[in-house]
Design a protein with these regions (language model features):
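Short acidic-hydrophobic, aromatic-tinged amphipathic segments that line or gate anion-handling sites
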Residues: 557-573
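A structural micro-motif
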Residues: 246-249, 534, 561
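Intrinsically disordered or compositionally simple regulatory linkers and C-terminal tails
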Residues: 1-18, 574-596
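Transmembrane helical cores of multi-pass ion-transport proteins
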Residues: 1-453, 485, 553-554
């Protein structure tokens, strides 16, 4: 029976949980630092406010869901995360996932999936797997991020153009898929509202141009204020523009931190929610750790990946308890925090508290904001997410990277994010395995030295005084010996060793890794040669392959006398074996004469 030391595992897991807030307070916290954090927190709150509302509505949810997430998850990420300056909350990357889960499983399913994702993140952090998410290939990340950006932008066409899709939908819900939405928008195009188009253009112009005026006040806040006033003026003239209040009438009564009423928890299928929850966890982990790495470069410190994942997990467990949605670290808000003087998690906590005050006391005024304005704000976010310059750079990369990126992009747009990440990672892994297998080779050094093969001679075999004796063949192996290269390795040896030498030296100084499949191929080579009277000698075996050979018993089968650290010793062993074989043959020839 396996004995597991759960106390040790628990102690190790808790040792990985070292929130940055605790470390900052232990180092000492001054009023000067608090003042700097307070200013940064206020500015970041101004940036986060319109985004929290816009992202929530873009996902098909009321604005209080996004605000609750910005408050609860934003506070938890700062309090329990492993990055000093991380700002958390709802992000545009989650819009696609949230929309799909909400459409299929309802609000209860979305809350359950968010909490499940939080548990997954906590487990990953406690198990010390904070770095495993970093192994997702870069082309996969660029591909699905660009795909999400395109879907987000497409989802804002209704708001940007002020379309009335009710006739085209005929009482049904808006399709969750990309092509389905475009079809509905195309049929609804005659209902375009030119006043909404004007507000959308004004929003885009203000958000883009305001940066030239000042970066202390977010352009999105200015756009919301100005376009809301414009919409009120148009309404007084009899021109109607859809607002948050007209789509979500309950907002006029104010916002609260509470679970939505009327949810059927008994209908939640937790097994069916595992895959969506995994998508949330992966995306939250990727986004938060990427944001933390960017923050490290800006402040000259290093974050704790495991603690950051635990903090993200806690935030996603708490967020749905107050009516929130999935959350993660936000790169743009984190950068804004740093640029405005935020240096400790207190800035993130204050940003959440400022948003809470706005939510409780000014939330009812969100009903006046035009939907076209939010569409413009989200469209800007989608453009920034797309990072087309990275896509252009990858298109000039290897064909394998381009294939992985395009696969992730197309699957994100046409299928869903879960399939895109899984397929992208698998495709990247298979292509990497193929490249690694192609780079592994076994070269016949004997033929090369004799001038029968082209190529560079191994450095020390051409030295004076080192001569490969007749009846010996030497093969030099380059690269990793693993399942992707095992057959190629075996076929090369067996096809080139056509003369059946008496001694076959396998030089393995450039083989740093050996797996079970490659070891099995090596066993087959040994069996093939041994059955034909050929002795296999190994030279320069590195640590990991040698350890595997010892554990598997392969070293005992070929004999430890036939394993040497240097090629000179291996050649000396070959001479010894050849001399022994020669003397044995001579005695065998004399024996019949003596018998007569």
């Amino acid at each position: 029976m396996l004995n597991v030391n759960w106390k040790l595992i628990g102690k190790t897991g808790l040792d990985r949980f070292r929130p940055a807030l605790w470390e900052c307070l232990r180092e000492g916290y001054s009023w000067k630092t608090f003042a700097s954090d307070a200013v940064a927190g206020l500015i970041v709150a101004a940036v986060a406010l319109p985004l929290a509302i816009a992202f929530s509505i873009a996902a098909g949810l009321p604005p209080q869901a996004g605000m609750a997430t910005a408050v609860v998850a934003g506070l938890a990420i700062s309090a329990f995360g492993g990055c000093r300056v991380q700002i958390g909350g709802p992000t545009g990357a989650f819009i696609v996932i949230i929309y799909g889960i909400y459409a299929q499983f309802g609000m209860a399913g979305l809350m359950a999936a968010t909490a499940m994702a939080g548990v997954m993140l906590v487990v990953l952090g406690l198990c010390g797997l904070g770095s495993i998410i970093k192994y997702i290939p870069y082309p996969v990340t660029v591909g699905f991020t660009s795909g999400i950006a395109l879907i987000i932008f497409a989802g804002q066409i209704e708001a940007l153009l002020g379309l009335d899709c009710s006739t085209a939908l005929a009482g049904a819900k808006m399709p969750g898929d990309f092509l389905g939405k475009l079809a509905i928008y195309a049929r609804s195009f005659p209902t375009i509202n030119w006043a909404a188009v004007g507000i959308s253009i004004a929003t885009l112009a203000i958000c883009i141009g305001w940066k030239r005026v000042t970066q202390r006040v977010p352009g999105s806040i200015v756009a919301i204020v100005m376009t809301t006033l414009a919409a009120m003026a148009l309404r007084s003239l009899g021109v109607e523009v859809e607002t948050i209040g007209s789509r979500f009438p309950e907002v006029a009564g104010g916002m609260t931190l509470a679970l939505p009423k009327g949810m059927d928890w008994g209908a939640v299928d937790f097994r069916a929610l595992f895959s969506p929850a995994l998508s949330i966890a992966l995306l939250a982990g990727i986004e938060s750790l990427l944001s933390a790495v960017v923050a490290d470069g800006m402040i000259g410190r290093r974050h704790n990946s495991n603690t950051e994942l635990i903090g993200q997990g806690i935030a996603n467990i708490l967020s749905p308890l107050f009516g929130g949605i999935p959350a993660t670290g936000a790169i743009a808000r984190t950068a804004t925090n740093i640029k405005n003087g935020g240096r400790t998690p207190v800035a993130g906590i204050l940003h959440a508290l400022f948003l809470l005050l706005v939510m409780l006391f000014l939330g009812r005024y969100a009903a006046l904001i035009p939907m076209a304005t939010l569409g413009g704000v989200v469209a800007i976010v989608a453009y920034n997410m797309s990072e087309w310059h990275l896509v252009k750079g990858l298109l000039r990369s290897t064909r394998s990277d381009v294939l992985v990126m395009l696969t992730s992009f197309l699957l994100t747009v046409l299928v869903d994010l879960t399939v895109a990440i899984q397929a992208g990672v698998l495709l990247a892994a298979f292509l990497f395995i193929r490249r690694m297998g192609e780079s592994t080779e076994a070269r016949d050094v004997t033929r090369l030295l004799a001038g029968h093969d082209e190529g560079r001679r191994p450095d020390d075999l051409g030295q004076p005084g080192i001569v490969i004796p007749e009846g010996t063949e030497v093969f030099e192996v380059y690269g990793a010996l693993f399942f992707g290269a095992a057959d190629k390795f075996k076929d090369t040896l067996l096809s080139h060793a056509h003369k059946l030498p008496r001694v076959l030296i396998l030089r393995m100084r450039h083989v740093l890794m050996l797996d079970a499949t490659a070891l099995h191929s090596l066993e087959e080579v040994y069996a093939h040669t041994h059955a034909r009277g050929v002795t296999l000698v190994l030279s320069g075996v590195t640590a990991q392959p040698l350890m595997l050979m010892v554990r598997s018993g392969f070293l005992d089968r070929i004999g430890q006398d036939n394993v040497h650290s240097h090629i000179i010793d291996a050649i000396a062993r070959a001479r010894q074996l050849l001399a022994t074989t020669t003397s044995t043959d001579k005695r065998a020839q004399r024996t019949p004469k003596e018998a007569r």
